[in-house]
Structures are given as structure tokens and as C-alpha cells.
Amino acid sequence: MTEKFLFLYLSLLPMPLLSQAQWNENSLVSFSKIIASGNHLSNCWICHNFITRSSSYQYILVRNFSLNLTFGSGIPEGQHKSVPLQVSLANSAHQVPCLDLTPPFNQSSKTSFYFYNCSSLNQTCCPCPEGHCDRKNTSEEGFPSPTIHPMSFSPAGCHPNLTHWCPAKQMNDYRDKSPQNRCAAWEGKELITWRVLYLLPKAHTVPTWPKSTVPLGGPLSPACNQTIPAGWKSQLHKWFDSHIPRWACTPPGYVFLCGPQKNKLPFDGSPKITYSTPPVANLYTCINNIQHTGECAVGLLGPRGIGVTIYNTTQPRQKRALGLILAGMGAAIGMIAPWGGFTYHDVTLRNLSRQIDNIAKSTRDSISKLKASIDSLANVVMNNRLALDYLLAEQGGVCAVISKSCCIYVNNSGAIEEDIKKIYDEVTWLHNFGKGDSAGSIWEAVKSALPSLTWFVPLLGPAALNSLLSPLWPLSL
């Protein structure tokens, strides 16, 4: 088991631990490059809030954007398969366009018969306990499998019998036929008075798809609005309205966020949609019309709590706060940060999301190879991957620590500075910026973060490995 986790560690961390020059795979450095490039920054410090093991990654729903999906036909293979990754859902104060992949319907409004052959035809009443009913009719197209219904038969017709039950797995609508020695579902008031369910996808009966596949999906978020128009919604709805297996994928930087099955449509005793607490969603880069039901939107993925403050060195007393990136503010592309003064470029958000999505994919793929639980283990490894990248950036000297922030320097050419000596020289500006009562403590914090001993670097390998794997040891027992 230990060897498997070692493989997982190596596959998730392709950057050589002993190299201070190769930072392309470090998420903190990548985030800084994207922010600097997307906002044309130079001569400034980008300070990130630290991400710890307890941090998580989440997505925001987006609005007011154009999106070109990739469409294909046939059974999804390879990268087009739908492998879920559960993510946290940021609360949104704004309504966003969502789409019901399959429309909901009120089951109690349907009159349906469930015909079964009885195994004991010479009885006055023919009960149909589970295992003694022979299903004879096929299901009406588009209806989901209902729950257990009371079943009985008598010469006078169908009556409720709460002691004998059959699983009503098939539905059809033969109102003109009598039971004729067959057990039929009671047509009266059900034990559950009413419920709302999603129809099954159009291509769910495809012969080559595994029969054990369970439809995926549920309601997504209170922020969803089915009436808000969006080009991707009409395209996806039209494409999935077919009995031929079809799939659709988002472009890089975007993901589908779909409601999990733990979120429930209204049912008897709960007249409103119920959502999980804390809110979660299933992340997909591709979905299909074979197994996906419920509500979906398009979103951007990012680590929870990643905050960015930019200190402009050309204006010593000015602090430009760019705010939280992809974290909890429920913002849409182009929305002005609530603290004012700055609007994110959509390319910046999209590139940040793409970078995090790549990390999430590598996590998910590695977990899949180990045949472990994606929802539980992938989240743990993902959180530790981000925390480890921040640790490496700090101890490797690429970022300077001020209070609870890890600061990356953007040089005159707009590139992320990776030369430790130049970083040390420029950090004097942060000392001057912080002149006042707390200047000494800030300066000491900065100096303490910059490495001065080369012997410390080789220790990063064992420390990083222990940091990544320590929360996973109980799983190997």
C-alpha cells in the first residue's frame, strides 16, 4: 500500500524537489504568472493567502459569457468519459443560467399499471412478494424506476395490500386491460403521496452501455435559473435530444458543475428542493445523454480561500486589492470586486481555472489508477498538493512570507522573478511600504522566509513526502 501512495506522490508532483530553477509545475508560481500576464502587471508583489491541508477547492458559477462546447457521438471513451470529482460550491448572490438535462415531472399525476404474472394462480388473492413476480411488460419510455408499490390481486380488482410488496420496476399505461390472473399495482393513493423525479436520459437504454449504470444527477443550486438564456444551454439541449449516445465537453478552463444525487427534488413532507450542507457539486469535463440527469451549469474551478493582494512598487503608498480569486464571492466573469476599483479579465479567470483543473485531473487520474474512492481520497490529495506547492515556494525562496501571505515578485519585464538574490534585494521595498509600528515585525518575517543556507534544500524531499502522505496513512491500514 505504501508503494502505491509513493507512486501517487510522484505522479502528482513532477517538479524535481532539488531544483530551484524549474517552477513551471508549481501551482503558486503558475497562479502568479496567470495573474501577472492577464492584468499586465510589472514591478509589483503578488501576495497569496496560504493554503493549508484544511483548505479545499471549489468552483463559482459563471454568467454573461460565450462558450463553445465540443460535441461527439457514440459511447464515451477515454477523455470523454464522465468521471465525477466532488467539489465545494461557492455561495452565489447572483442567478446564473442552468439547464435541466432531463426535465422533472410530478410522478403522482401519472396513472400507471404494473402487470406481473402470479406464481400461485389458484389462490383467492394472489399476493406478489418480491421474487415471485414475472415481469411481462416493458417500461414506458422516459419514466424512471419508481419505488416499491403495494401489490395484490382479487377477482374484484386491485386493492391495497400493505403486507405483500413487489418492486415496481416497469411502467406502462394499459388502462383498457383487466388484471386477468395478474398482479397489478394499486392505482389509489400511494404511501408517498407525491414526488417529483427526473426523466431518464434519452439514450439510457443503449445496448452497449453497462446495465448497472445508475443515472447521475440532482438539483444543483438555489442560484440556478432555468429561464436565463445561454448559447451553450440551447446547443446542449438540442444535442442530447436523441436516442443515439452523445457526449459534450467543455473547453479548457471551464467545467460542467452538476447537482449530486444527495440533493433532492420535492417529495411528500419536503415541498421544497433540499440541498446538501455544505453545498457540493459534481465536476465533469464531459457529460452524456446516457447516464446524466438533473441540473447542470458551467463554472470555473479554483482553490477555496486563495486571496491575492497586489502591492505596486511604483506607487509606494498605494495598495491595489484585487480580491479573492475564484473563492466564495460568487462572482461572474467581469464582475467588479465588492471592495472596488478592479475588474477581472475573463482570460485571467479562465486560465486560473484551467490550471486548477489540470491539477484536479492529475489527482483524479492517479486515484483512479489505484481504484480508490475518488470523492474521499482525491480531495485529501488535492488539498495536500496545493499546500505542498506553497511550502516548496516558501522554502525554495521564490515567495517571501509576510504575516499569513506568500508574496511573489513580478519584475520589470512582467515575469515571475525566480532569482533568490534579486528577490532578496526587492523585498526591501516591502520593508519601506510597511514603515510604522509594525515595520520591524514585517521585516523580520520577510527575512526569516528567505533561505540563506543551501543545506536546507535537500531536506525538502522527505518533508514534502511526509506532508503529502501523512493524512493518508490511516487509509492503508
Swiss-Prot record:
Expressed in placenta. Its main location: membrane. It comes from the Eukaryota. It is found in: Membrane. Glycans are attached at residue 68. It is a single-pass type I membrane protein. Keywords: ERV, Glycoprotein, Membrane, Signal, Transmembrane, Transmembrane helix, Transposable element. It holds the Pfam family TLV_coat. The chain crosses the membrane at residues 322-342. Residues 343-477 are cytoplasmic. One of its GO terms (cellular component) is membrane. Residues 1-21 form the signal peptide. Residues 22-321 are extracellular. InterPro entries: TLV/ENV_coat_polyprotein (IPR018154). PANTHER family: ENDOGENOUS RETROVIRUS GROUP V MEMBER 1 ENV POLYPROTEIN, VIRAL ENVELOPE PROTEIN. Belongs to the gamma type-C retroviral envelope protein family. This is Endogenous retrovirus group V member 1 Env polyprotein. It comes from Homo sapiens (Human). The lineage of its organism: Eukaryota, Metazoa, Chordata, Craniata, Vertebrata. The gene is ERVV-1.
